[in-house]
Amino acid sequence: MKRVVLSSLLVPALLGFAAGALAQADVPHSRDVKKTNLLDHSNSNLIDSATAKQVLIDNIPAKVWKIQNPGAYAFLSQVEGGLNAQRTCVVTARVMVLPLTGTLNVPMWRPLPKMTATAFDSQPNSSSDGCKAVAKDKLKEATLAIGSGIGKM
């Protein structure tokens, strides 16, 4: 009698779990913003925070979420630079992968970040719009470098 009751409760529970897992399998993890921790500390004259976070979302490959737990790390972007007196645009973009604490879900700066990628460029005779385009492009390049190296963590 106990086996019949146990199996009648266990089978629907397993089917419900399997259906939930299949429903989540259709959602690409790289687009699921709720599962990612994105931080931005960029120069607002070059790129705003929403644009920087969108660049991260669009360029972190789905394989990252298959290899790493999305709730275990935060991605920090930082874009610095600007136009100098000679109208040369100088941009440095950095993306870091920071582990999160287990209890508070806060990024840990120490020990050092798990991974860091930096991309930089300069463009002579540039405008402020051209400099913003370079900043976005360099942030994309640094994000793709993080994505390609994530399997080595």
Question: Which residue stretches match the model-derived regions?
Answer:
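A structural "domain/chain start" motif
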Residues: 2-7, 18-62, 150-153
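Repetitive helical segments and hydrophobic/amphipathic motifs
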Residues: 11-12
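Short, Lys/Arg-enriched charge-dense amphipathic segments
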Residues: 45-59, 87-102, 129-137
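Sec/Tat-exported extracytoplasmic proteins
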Residues: 56-64, 68, 139-150
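Short secondary-structure boundary motifs at beta->alpha junctions and helix caps
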Residues: 102-148
